[in-house]
């Protein structure tokens, strides 16, 4: 099933400000990816700013990849402020199943902050759903659960949209579920490629006027198409892929999304 692009042009017209509390591995890549797409990144995790920055932003991304110092407190404060001013909040629960500190951080965030989108790999979402899964650090790992059911369960439990990234991506808001069949095997070879996807989703949510399911679906299709285009002619050249991915995000058009997107609903 093909899709019509609704939000990409709006991102480039509106240049939304994306507040990222992200990890030290992903910060540069996420910022450059957002710039390439047409959004404006703001990369701040200073707890002293968390009552102000969300008030000038259009969306907040909380990524727990490298929890340092007062990061958890900053995330909670920023999330609560974002909820107060009514901007969407995206959660990337990096490696939530790896340590008790990460699990407790996510438990507290989900209890105290309302999220518009939770984006993670299969292992991360299985952990949030309480399903048995053999995660490998921050990587997806292996398991035998129904991932569509996991996406729907988490979406219903927290009243949000869920995106599970993998060879086939799954998007659900608990009542409607779609799968995205674009992408490339080079994505897992580049660190922070999933973190950038969360940031890209945030840019789409920022201009979606509350239509978070359709915005997440288009964001996922757009990003995975950019990956396909970047990977053309490459096999193991992951360094070239990373740079070309930024170029393809900048070159992406609504027409390309409509022509190349492969989704099942």
From Swiss-Prot:
Pathway note: Cofactor biosynthesis; thiamine diphosphate biosynthesis; 4-methyl-5-(2-phosphoethyl)-thiazole from 5-(2-hydroxyethyl)-4-methylthiazole: step 1/1
CDD domains with a match to the protein in the record: THZ_kinase
Reaction(s) the record says it catalyses: 5-(2-hydroxyethyl)-4-methylthiazole + ATP = 4-methyl-5-(2-phosphooxyethyl)-thiazole + ADP + H(+)
SUPFAM superfamilies: Ribokinase-like
Enzyme class: transferase
Binding site residues for ATP: 119, 165
EC number(s) on file: 2.7.1.50
Main function: Catalyzes the phosphorylation of the hydroxyl group of 4-methyl-5-beta-hydroxyethylthiazole (THZ).
Name the UniProt record assigns to this protein: Hydroxyethylthiazole kinase
Organism listed in the record: Haemophilus influenzae (strain 86-028NP)
């Amino acid at each position: 099933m093909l899709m019509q692009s609704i939000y990409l042009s709006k991102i480039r017209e509106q240049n939304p400000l994306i507040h990222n509390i992200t990890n030290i591995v992903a910060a540069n890549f996420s910022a450059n990816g957002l710039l390439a797409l047409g959004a404006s990144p703001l990369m701040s995790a200073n707890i002293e700013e968390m009552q102000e920055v969300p008030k000038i932003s259009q969306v907040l991304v909380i990524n727990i990849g490298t929890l340092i110092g007062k990061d958890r407190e900053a995330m909670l404060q920023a999330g609560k402020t974002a909820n107060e001013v009514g901007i969407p909040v995206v959660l990337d629960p990096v490696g939530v199943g790896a340590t008790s500190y990460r699990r407790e951080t996510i438990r507290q965030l989900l209890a105290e902050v309302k999220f518009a989108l939770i984006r993670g790999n299969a292992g991360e979402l299985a952990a949030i759903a309480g399903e048995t899964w053999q995660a490998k650090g921050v990587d997806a790992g292996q398991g035998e659960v129904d991932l569509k059911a996991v996406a729907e369960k988490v979406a219903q439990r927290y009243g949000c949209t869920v995106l599970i990234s993998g060879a086939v991506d799954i998007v659900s808001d608990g009542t409607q579920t779609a799968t995205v069949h674009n992408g490339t095997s080079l994505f897992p070879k580049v660190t922070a490629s999933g973190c950038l996807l969360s940031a890209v989703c945030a840019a789409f949510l920022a201009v979606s006027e509350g239509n978070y399911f359709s915005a997440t679906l288009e964001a996922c299709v757009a990003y995975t198409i950019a990956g396909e285009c970047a990977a053309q002619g490459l096999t193991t050249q992951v360094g070239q892929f990373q740079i070309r991915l930024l170029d393809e995000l900048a070159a992406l058009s609504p027409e390309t999304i409509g022509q190349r997107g492969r989704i099942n609903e």
